[in-house]
Amino acid sequence: MNASLATRALLTLLLLLAPLTGLAQPTGIPQDRIFDVGQLKPLDSALKVKVGDPAPDFSLPTIDGGTVTLAQYRGKKNVVLSFVPAAWTPVCSGQWPGYNIVQDMFEATDTQLIGVSVDNVPTLHAWVQEMGGLWFPVASDFHPHGALADALGILRSNGEAERSLFLIDKQGVIRYIDVHDINSRPDLGPLVKAMRELKK
């Protein structure tokens, strides 16, 4: 087994056995710039979709000045939507940088990760720059406020999105959902397993 395969096998094992909380990369953001929201109600919404449903299409502005749509990946790549509740908060500021160690797993399964928040583009742009940049597109569901989050049934009563993951296949069908306790990062193991199932 060459070094690359050994490294991938080790990362896979870690992902399947450990939650992302144990694997997250440092945010790079000084603690005095992070807003501590305290303990929140774990869930505050009702899903409007289920596994097997077609995913709602979307067109969202990204922090690089472009636009991302679900349609642009149809027939080409699976898509993972990673929703976080709010920029500049502790858990969110650790979650997305944590994906840096699994970029090759997304690529190996023909899967595009898209980060989504209901924050506006300037806020997201400043936050991502402070984190040192990310390898995946970051999109704003700010206007109409939370439209995509609402269509999925993950818009909380305070206007934030639930911390959640949606895996959508190349045909636009939802194959995996994790609406997670807003106070902690989700375990990526089950998501990686679902991504690999689509690769078979």
Please provide the spans of the model-predicted regions:
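N-terminal targeting signals for export/organelle localization
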Residues: 2-61
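Short loop/turn microsegments at loop-to-beta-strand junctions
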Residues: 55-56, 80, 162-164
